[in-house]
Amino acid sequence: MTELTHLFKPGRLGRYPTRNMIKYGACCVSNYNTRDGFITPRELARVRVIAGTGCGIITNQGAYPDPKGEGKSYFRQVALYDDKFLPQFETIARYIHDAGSVAIQQILHAGRYGGIDLGYCVQPSVVPQTLPHFRPPREMSKDDIRRCIREHVEAAKRAIKAGFDGVEVTSFMGYLLASFNSKFTNQRTDEYGGSLENRGRFMRELIDGVKQALPEHPLIVRLNGAELMDQWGGNTEDECFELMEQAARAGVDQISVTVGWQEAPESSIGRDIAPGHWNYLATRAKKTCPGTQIAFGNRLPDPDMANDCIGRGEFDVWEVCRPLLADPQLIHKAAEGRLDEVRRCIGSLNCLSRLFRDLPYSCTMNPALGHEVEPEYAITPAAVKKKIMVIGAGPAGMEYAITAAKRGHAVTVYEKGERIGGNLYAFAAHDLARPEDLMSVVRHYEVMAKKLGVEMKFNTEANAKLMRSVLHQYDVCVVASGARIDMEAYAGIDGRERLLDALDVAHGRVQAGKRVVVIGGGKIGLVLAESLRKNGAEVTLVERDKRIAGDVMPTFKWRHTTWVEELGIPVHTSARLKRVTAEGAFIVDGKGKETLLPADSVIAAGPRKANQELFTEFEWMVDELHGCGDALMPRGMDAAIHGGYRLGVRI
Amino acid sequence: MVAGWQSVLDRHAELFSEIEEEASLAIVPRRFVAPVCDPVPMLLWVREPDGMAARTGQFGGFKALSSDLLLIANDGTLEQALSGNEPLAEIKRQLRAGGMLFMVLRRKDELREHGWEDFLEWLGMPFLGACR
């Protein structure tokens, strides 16, 4: 049983008792719905999983409140400006109540980031966008402001009519409420702009409007503890907390403390931010607004840590979302003392990378997310229990192995190395952000393999000889042998025998010198170059393409380019290797100019080639032969995990 | 100052090679930036037939500005950038450090049509944001 007594003590939100101090935060719009704002079966199936997470309070994702769609920020965001949307909201409220939780509906008017289907967005003042993704601004008139408040109130009433217990208005990340509060975007000279009191007027009128209409129902506001926009003329932290006081005085039932704007020059929730980094903002909110419940969860993915914070009185409610995308059973596992089984959110922000390309969100760690409506993605008992051999203990092989084992198959994994993880292990060892996040993937597979009885055979190379030795013992063979650096791609290069293989260097099988040239500015080359440079080597990066980081997750590209600059790694783009000598690497740029890059080690970090030879070798030696992950097509960890899972639920 | 930036633009011609003729980027000191203001001198990077040209112009507020992009600099930041070895890299650094601010005066599709994609990508603008 749990020792997380603070997290699992009963609580209260307004007049509603809650079974614990955990709130499912509406951190992400799913983009699973129709273009005109109706909730789809896909969304309903997803929300059913959310309802089952065990959180005491569950917030349904933000709906835009206006018929014009000025508040709409995401391609397939849900709407709440008309009763025609209510039937599906009623279903969602019922799911949440059936699961024993308090149901909150978020109202999300994106303001500066809205108007996705329009040619403009609305703001308190015309302050041009700083990110090209968003629409050019129009200033709201006083009539617009009054109408906007009315639309929020009507949307709130509609949510209650659908069966929700309360509503939340979000100013997260620079949405409309935030842009009224901030002096960066609010440069009005009327009663809605200027002083902090005036800038907070929109928020107070909004709170007052909703509270007057729905006095019996809890109202939550999400407010920035830090905008991270102060260098550009935004609010200071002191101003953010004064606005929180205004909200508390206006009678909100809970303040959810958030961090940062979309366009802030710093990151706030990615892998490079240490868990607990922003806790001081929650602590300050609690001190500033002692009579108001404070919810917090930014970059606080760990239930143990959240439990301790609540115990110390730093905040009242742990607001969590992304960790529950990665593992919807997180709360139940925490309650049952099974935290070692949790599949951790690794902060890759695949979810957001996809949202900003108008795609439905997905999760690196949870391949079933967004596919709950499809029975094909469910783990069900296998009709025929099989003996299965898996070649390779990287993410694809292990994901397949544990999925198959959950279905009742007997699984044995053959791994030529001495541990689980494959190239991910080497990648994590050199990662400058937070190696612990990537290592948590490896640890998860280690724990689950043990618990599920997956047999691991390390230091065992899979080849025809091995296969002959186990002939007819297995029904299925899954080749998840990963990918390698394609050294044959350098066949025409003089001195190619001097090249080092990036994976050999990353795994520590080969030592690089003190002056290094890395050929290939994709993620393998970047991670290795950054790590070698950080450890004191002089490193130069050479990339054929116009830009580096072509295969890196969009939300992490900036991080690599910044590291490369900060570490002082010279980069030669649109350049290719011509020859390697004892002096170093000779490269040729796009104009044909040859340059010597002095080096004692020249490392080939690309291109990659799938390890597919075993498919041919094993073709006539086993009943079923399948493949997954980089062995099919070198892509990356997400594709490997998702591919392993999809094969696992199918065979 | 103009000659200095011209030399920088010439050195990085490949970043601006796709930009449409007459498309421009304006650079203005932060203290002057307002929707409308009395005309003050500004620096312009304008695409001409032979490449990107550095020029001076008059800034009367961003409402009337015909440029696609506006770079706002704290006092001294631009001069500091120009005096270093890599002025464009310094601009990129200052954008992240808060010494400069970038404003987008056209829609994304218009910027793409005008050929700014390479430059914006190089600056890392599509990937900025705290939500990461």
Which residues fall in each region the model found?
Chain B
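Feature captures hydrophobic
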Residues: 1-132
